[in-house]
Amino acid sequence: KGRNIIGWDEILEGGLAPNATVMSWRGVEGGITAAKAGHDAIMTPSPYAYLDQYQEEPETAPTTIGGYNTLKKTYSYNPVPDDAEELIKKHIIGVQGNIWNEYMQNDERRDYQAFPRAIALAETGWTQNSRKNWNSFRNRMIEDFERMDVINVKACRNFFDVNINTHVYDGTLKAVLETFYPDAEIRYTTDGSAPTAKSELYTQPFIWEGNIDLQAAAFKGGKMLGKVNGKKLYANLISGKRYTTTPHWGWMSGDIFGENDVLLSLIHISEP
């Protein structure tokens, strides 16, 4: 008596109690469905709000449960769709970040998983989507990192590094490099050597030939901001091609955890 129920969105499947609040984790649909039915909903979808997922290159990052959720992706989330009905807006009462600890042995590791993405999620919760600005946020993040350093929060520092991705443009597979640090230069090499302030300057996505060992870092004022990130990229006859048959569930598609609908490398082929 006098208590309210709150549960993950699976409780939608068994019929909701009149006072039930739904935590929408399997995407946003559960929260929308609950709100339409007049129930409060907390938006905590796995693709954006699970802070135990990878936030930097999985090959070199500490082991997590999986997924791939960057600082920028977390910040991009809009918990209340702009075109939502008033009833839905009324019943979406907030956002929630989740961390499951089975891969985290200590507080330092939990700091690494939570920050800085918890800051992005907090701003997402208290700022109207129309007023959010990624460039403003990442400029302010520089001071936030200074504050975290002072109070000994061991945040992930991928903000100062370069993210290496691949995407298909007009049927052609290209390498895409990005750093979250504002106004930084990206310098890279393709032979496995560490980039310097005089290495090739990244200006736009580029095509590569054969197999390369791509190494990249962010620089400002001639100084490297973070660490060097690397990825071996392979080019062969199937690179960038779309599926012609339904793939087996276990095949890896896209560049990271199946985010693109192209098959990059079932096998590595070094010759035609």
Q: What do the PLM-derived regions correspond to, one by one?
A:
Residues K1-A20, W25-T33:
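Active-site neighborhood of glycoside hydrolase catalytic domains
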Residues G2-D9, A41-P45, Q128-W134, C156, ...:
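Acidic/polar loop patches that form or flank catalytic/metal-binding clefts of enzymes
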Residues I5-G7, V22-S24, A41-T44, I93-G97:
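Hydrophobic faces of well-ordered beta-strands that scaffold small-molecule active sites
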Residues E10-L12, W25-G27, S46-Y48, N98-E102:
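Active-site beta-loop-alpha junctions enriched in small/polar residues
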Residues N19-T21, I32-I42, S46-E59, T63-G66:
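Polar, glycine-rich mid-to-C-terminal structural blocks
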Residues Q55-E56, T60-T172, F180-A184:
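Substrate-binding clefts and catalytic carboxylate motifs of secreted carbohydrate-active enzymes
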Residues K132, R138-L266:
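Short, compositionally stereotyped local motifs that mark structural "simplifiers"
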Residues I267-P272:
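Conserved small/polar residues in nucleotide/adenosyl-binding loops
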